[in-house]
Amino acid sequence: MLCGGTSQPVDADEQIQKICDSMKPHAEAQAGKTFDVFVAKTYTTQCVPGTNYFIKVHVGGDEHVHLRVYKKLPCNGETLELSKMLQDKRHHDPLEYF
């Protein structure tokens, strides 16, 4: 990984699913709809003053969304915020910086 670049995509784990679970209401508000399915599939990270998580999330059928979630540093409370969401993604779409 380059300094400031993103890591290689890896399979999502329980920690990443917990992040997605906490971001689901924010993603639904941004999308203007509810998601019956919201399962993290893969993710990458970017080290900034905190951490950016880029997460591919299955939302039903062949539909996915890509989330960018920012986690603040411990000295700033380690809170999470949904920075951006890309909709109309598919399983085969690469998870890239956005």
Curated annotation (Swiss-Prot):
Tissue: Ubiquitously expressed in normal and lipopolysaccharide (LPS)-stimulated tissues including brain, eye, gullet, heart, liver, muscle, stomach, kidney, spleen, pyloric ceca, intestine and gill.
Domain of life: Eukaryota
Site, Reactive site: residue positions: 4
Chief location of this protein within or outside the cell: cytoplasm
GO cellular component annotations of the record: cytoplasm; cytosol
Locus of motif Secondary area of contact: 46-50
Activity regulation, short description: Greatly decreased inhibitory activity against papain protease by metal ions including ZnSO(4), CuSO(4), HgCl(2) and CoCl(2). Decreased inhibitory activity against papain protease by detergents including Tween 20, SDS and Brij 35.
GO BP terms in the entry: cellular response to bacterial lipoprotein; innate immune response
pH relationship of activity: Optimum pH is 6-7.5 and pH 6.5-8 for papain and bovine cathepsin B, respectively.
Gene Ontology MF annotations: cysteine-type endopeptidase inhibitor activity
Family to which the UniProt record says this protein belongs: Belongs to the cystatin family.
Name of the protein this chain belongs to: Cystatin-B
